[in-house]
């Protein structure tokens, strides 16, 4: 039995430095088609993909993101929850469909659809020899992103993805993930605090050693310290407001 896909995904790491070589239209089309083949809840296909190669648009999005590789890449994708087409169907429907696509469940369906599509594209791109990095930073200013991309109601930007050939001096590596026994619960969830704390303590040590070796001692923080810093930072607290402005999560 071939383990090609297993070995490919196990090597995944974010690439943040790319060669100045744009993806061809053929490659972009193949990536999007691979994304479209992902599973979709109830065949709703509640997503769209916006492909961006316009340098001005990239620069505008970089201002939102604050990350140079939003501009410096082979191609930029933005993944959106998309119920605009469903809204158009609703205009001629005998039932009130907005109760569904404006619901919290509708939001979850769209976000999951977009994520599944994006992961298909990521794996396909890596199989082609490209590197990728996801860009949640586009949510730093959702209103501005909606303006830049001319998004109508019922469409919400979830994240972006930069794709391209890794630069010759790109030296990223796969980070150690949480232990198998910590994320895989057999038959039911195991919430024993002592076990959870012990597993996280071991993982903290693993991550601290990883950073220490990767940076020649310049970084030694643990995973728990990273989580405390990230979740303690009161950022993007306007998501509910922005979702509702888009016509989503009305109930």
Curated annotation (Swiss-Prot):
E.C. no: 1.6.-.-
Keyword Flavoprotein: yes
Keywords recorded for this protein, A-Z: Flavoprotein, FMN, NADP, Oxidoreductase
EC supergroup of this enzyme: oxidoreductase
Entry function: Reduces FMN, organic nitro compounds and disulfide DTNB. Involved in maintenance of the cellular redox state and the disulfide stress response.
Stored NCBIfam families: PRK10765.1
Name listed for the protein in its UniProt record: NADPH-dependent oxidoreductase
Lineage of origin: Bacteria, Bacillati, Bacillota, Bacilli, Bacillales
């Amino acid at each position: 039995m071939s383990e090609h896909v297993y070995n490919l995904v196990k090597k995944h790491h974010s690439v943040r430095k790319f060669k100045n070589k744009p993806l061809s239209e053929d490659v972009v089309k193949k990536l999007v088609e691979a994304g479209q083949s992902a599973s979709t809840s109830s065949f709703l296909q509640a997503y769209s993909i916006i492909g961006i190669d316009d340098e001005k648009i990239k620069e505008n999005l970089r201002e939102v993101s604050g990350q140079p590789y939003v501009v410096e890449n082979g191609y930029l994708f933005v993944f959106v929850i998309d119920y605009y087409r469903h809204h158009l169907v609703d205009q001629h429907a005998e039932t009130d469909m907005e109760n569904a696509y404006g619901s919290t469940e509708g939001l979850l369906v769209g976000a999951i659809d977009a994520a599944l599509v994006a992961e298909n594209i990521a794996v396909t791109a890596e199989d082609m020899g490209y590197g990728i990095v996801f860009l949640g930073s586009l949510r730093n200013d959702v209103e501005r992103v909606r303006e830049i991309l001319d998004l109508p109601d019922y469409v919400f930007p979830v994240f972006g993805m930069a794709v391209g050939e890794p630069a010759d001096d790109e030296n990223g590596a796969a980070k150690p993930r949480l232990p198998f026994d910590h994320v895989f619960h057999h038959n039911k969830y195991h919430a024993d605090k002592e076990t959870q704390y012990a597993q996280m303590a071991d993982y903290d040590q693993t991550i601290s050693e990883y950073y220490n070796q990767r940076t020649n001692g310049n970084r030694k923080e643990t995973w728990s310290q990273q989580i405390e810093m990230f979740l303690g930072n009161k950022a993007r607290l306007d998501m509910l407001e922005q979702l509702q402005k888009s016509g989503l999560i009305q109930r």
